[in-house]
Amino acid sequence: MMTARALVRQINELLSFLLEEGLAIDWNSAIIRDSGHDSILTWANAPDRLFDALVGRFATITEYRNLIENRHYHCMLFDGSIIQFGYLYTNNTLSKHRNCYYPCPLVITSSDIESIQTGHDFVTLFDLLLTQEIDALRAAISESEFSRLQNLLRLSTPFRFDFDPGSQTDTHPASHLHLLNEECRWPVFGPISIGHFVRFIFRHFYPKIWSKYDVLRNWGLQFHTRSITDQERGELFVECNDFSQRP
C-alpha cells in the first residue's frame, strides 16, 4: 500500500510534468501535515481543516471563484480547470481522501492565458471575462438574440471522488463520486489512487493530451481494500478491477 510520503512524491512528479509541458499555469506543491496519529496530504496554502473547508456551494461559480482566489488547488490547468488532491492517513492507514477536478465555468482561450503574467492574475482575468459574458447575455436576452450569442458560460460539473468510511450509511457510500450537487453520491468500488484520478481526468476531458503523452496513459494504478457493499452493487456504481492480480 502506498504511503502518504510516496503519494506526495507522485503528485509533485505529476505537477512538474504538467508545468514542463505547458499543461498547467499555476501550482502548489503537495505537502504533508502531521498531527498526532494523522498525516494529511494537502497543498502548501490549504486550509487547516481541509476535509471540512471544501464542503458546500458545490458546483457553483461562487465556489469556483473562491477556490481560484485563494489558490486552493494543487494545480490550475491551461484552461482554468483546477485539480485538488487530499488524503488523510491515520496510523499509516488511509482513512479519507478527497480528489476533485473542477472545470472552469468559462471558456478560456490560449490567447486569454497569454495576456496574464502568472496564475495569480487569473482571478482578474476570470472576473473580466465573466462580467463581459453577463453583459452580453443580458443584452442578448433583451434583444431576443440569445440563440445567436457565442456563449462562453459552460454547464460543466465538478467531479469529486470522496472516501470516508467513518461516515458510511445506507445512503452514504464509503467511497463515492459527487457530481452536479453535494447530495449526489454515486458509489465507487473503493478508494481511488492518484493513477485512477489522473487517467480519469485526461482520458475523458482532454483526449488529445491523453493520446499524446505516454506518461499519462501509463500512470500506475494502486488498489486499496474495496469498500463497495452488496447493496451498492445492486445499484449503478463506478467499478474498476485489479486484473494484474488475476492468475
Locate each region found by the language model.
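Amphipathic alpha-helical interface segments
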Residues: 41-44, 49, 85-95, 105
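Short secondary-structure capping micro-motifs at structural edges
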Residues: 70-73, 81-89, 144-149
